[in-house]
């Protein structure tokens, strides 16, 4: 009840003791959100952990009037030999969302451009109580479009990671267009307050448009990286 979500990362420490950000993220260590299912990498793939990498876990708590103990656990499985493929976790977000009060179906969007060819394996959308649906459309370099995933009934309590039946080739220059739908009306029984306009924020009474997805570059140019928005 208290743990809202966990964001795991690995990286290195900034040698400058006066730096605003001491921890420099380099890759994803996964995470947790209500109802999230386990993510499985394809055979002969993994995430590259550099020598002397540090782990960071951002724990987000929401109070509910009772003292409790966090029993979160983290498990790491190591390959006995170097895998063939490097899975890369990418996170994108729209920090400028503005959802009007008393609005039944409001849309917001965000785009991500693939800078090199990659195989897309999984997608995980994240919103709060006003999030109701999302669509993921690939816009290929030739201008053609393809609906990769439609989530018609998003539920904050079941934030699922969607594994594609077959990985999808994202050509260099392909745009992943994400459309999120929000219900800020009194008809949404989970809505904390339909009378107020809502913007991006960390608390559940705020809102978010975030997407986490996993992909393997067709040609590995450098070790796994974690792209910050």
Predicted regions and their residues:
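Beta-strand-centric surfaces of beta-sandwich/beta-rich domains
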Residues: 1-119, 125-229
């Amino acid at each position: 009840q208290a743990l809202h979500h966990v964001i795991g990362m690995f990286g290195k420490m900034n040698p400058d003791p006066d730096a605003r950000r001491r921890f420099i993220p380099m890759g994803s260590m996964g995470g947790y959100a209500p109802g999230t299912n386990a993510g499985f990498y394809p055979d002969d793939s993994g995430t590259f952990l550099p020598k002397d990498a540090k782990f960071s876990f951002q724990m987000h708590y929401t109070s509910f009037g009772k003292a409790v103990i966090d029993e979160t656990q983290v498990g790491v499985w190591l390959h006995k030999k170097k895998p063939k493929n490097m899975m890369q976790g990418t996170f994108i977000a729209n920090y400028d969302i503005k959802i009007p009060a008393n609005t039944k179906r409001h849309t917001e969007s965000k785009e991500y451009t693939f800078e090199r060819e990659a195989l897309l394996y999984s997608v995980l959308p994240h919103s709060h109580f006003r999030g109701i649906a999302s669509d993921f459309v690939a816009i290929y370099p030739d201008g053609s479009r393809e609906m990769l995933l439609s989530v018609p009934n998003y539920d904050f309590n079941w934030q699922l990671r969607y594994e594609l039946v077959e990985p999808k080739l994202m050509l260099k220059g392909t745009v992943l267009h994400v459309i999120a739908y929000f219900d800020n009306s009194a008809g949404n029984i989970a809505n904390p307050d339909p009378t107020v306009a809502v913007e991006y924020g960390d608390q559940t009474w705020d809102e978010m448009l975030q997407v986490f997805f996993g992909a393997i570059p067709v040609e590995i140019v450098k070790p796994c990286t974690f792209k910050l928005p």
